[in-house]
Amino acid sequence: MSIKRYSSTADTTITNAYKSSLTTRGTGSNMGAADILEVFSLTGQESSGSVELSRLLIQFPVSGTATGEIKADRTAGTIPASGSVRFYLKLFNAKHGNTLPRDLILNVQAVSQSWAEGGGLDMENYTDIGVANWVSGNLSGSVGAPVSTKGGWDGAWGTSSMDQTTGYTPGGTYHTAAYDPGSDGMPMYTQTFTGGDEDLEVDVTAAVEEWVAGTYLNYGFGVHLTSSQEAYSVGDGTNVPRNLNGSSDSYYTKKFFSRTSDFFFKRPVL
């Protein structure tokens, strides 16, 4: 049995956490060039009812026609046909000196809107402003419009002006419809981290095959705490999502190595 690895082409952390002053949130901050990806839920830091969340976005070369993309490699015979190969998303745990939550459950969902990786670095004070961030996936402007019947903009490749932030939900926009293979929705995956320091390793074959088939555009995955572990909130309509089934406990903090990590063999792979 042979193994082929695909490295991520973009990844970043997005957050609505407060800056060090505890007066403003870092919702406009970008961390696309940081060497760490971070997921957490923090309650009661700014005030008794405050909610702070962090999620990650990650994308792989799946549906393109250039060498090194999964679809192109299948056409070339480099990887087997659908049904004869499995795809696993793997993120490597990054040890740190902060608290580490046990028994946390992370969801892996397909993202439904384009986003930019960005070049921000600051994961402490959130001073690097840019996209993607908690409230915006990308910039408005001239972009290429790919052929797609679902999950994107119709039309042949060309240049057209469109607002890529339209419809963007703070915290990321994900496929949430019930999954009907080849027809509607995208699968969602979960993993439980009993000790907290485990790597993430999830079989995401179904999602990858949907992207290769062109059912939806490949905007990668979002990884975040399951809703019962993200903080309880009635929502504020802007920065904090409504979550009436959430937790009053904090889950702080889970970290993974990003694609810019100096530890080459700890970078995310598919």
Question: What are these regions, as identified by a protein language model?
Answer:
Residues 1-269:
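Secreted, disulfide-rich extracellular signaling modules
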